[in-house]
Amino acid sequence: MLGAALRRCAVAATTRADPRGLLHSARTPGPAVAIQSVRCYSHGSQETDEEFDARWVTYFNKPDIDAWELRKGINTLVTYDMVPEPKIIDAALRACRRLNDFASTVRILEVVKDKAGPHKEIYPYVIQELRPTLNELGISTPEELGLDKV
């Protein structure tokens, strides 16, 4: 209510009536209205690495996840400046298998390789950790499919 009253006062102060009774904008500015600056801080607690991993594993382990939610989760995960932990990738690959979405499994593995960037030891480590899951689900790596040469 105070904000509305201040706006009404500011509008009234910036208009004047001429001799015919018509309202016109005043040539001089009205009284200055104090604007309070607000700082936007994140007051929430920081998410730990374990909580982050658990959140994404839970997301991909949803039994009723659909293809759109899967792609949305993968795309969101890709935007982070990090390589996902193997347990997150494992959950995502299992979600792909539940949906029979082979293309997404290959895309996930390609993204992991791309996110590793110049650190050549990360991708082989992730594949080594995921090898039992890849064998269980019958998923081939992009290298096994020959996609790394394309």
Curated annotation (Swiss-Prot):
Broad class of the protein's primary localization: mitochondrion
Gene Ontology terms, MF aspect: cytochrome-c oxidase activity; electron transfer activity; metal ion binding
Annotated positions of the Phosphothreonine modification: 141
Alphabetized CDD domains for the sequence: Cyt_c_Oxidase_Va
GO biological process, one term: mitochondrial electron transport, cytochrome c to oxygen
Keywords, ordered alphabetically: Acetylation, Disease variant, Heme, Iron, Membrane, Metal-binding, Mitochondrion, Mitochondrion inner membrane, Phosphoprotein, Primary mitochondrial disease, Transit peptide, Ubl conjugation
Record has Amino-acid biosynthesis as a keyword: no
Gene Ontology CC, one term: mitochondrion
Motif SIFI-degron: chain residues: 2-17
Reported function: Component of the cytochrome c oxidase, the last enzyme in the mitochondrial electron transport chain which drives oxidative phosphorylation. The respiratory chain contains 3 multisubunit complexes succinate dehydrogenase (complex II, CII), ubiquinol-cytochrome c oxidoreductase (cytochrome b-c1 complex, complex III, CIII) and cytochrome c oxidase (complex IV, CIV), that cooperate to transfer electrons derived from NADH and succinate to molecular oxygen, creating an electrochemical gradient over the inner membrane that drives transmembrane transport and the ATP synthase.
Protein name per its UniProtKB record: Cytochrome c oxidase subunit 5A, mitochondrial
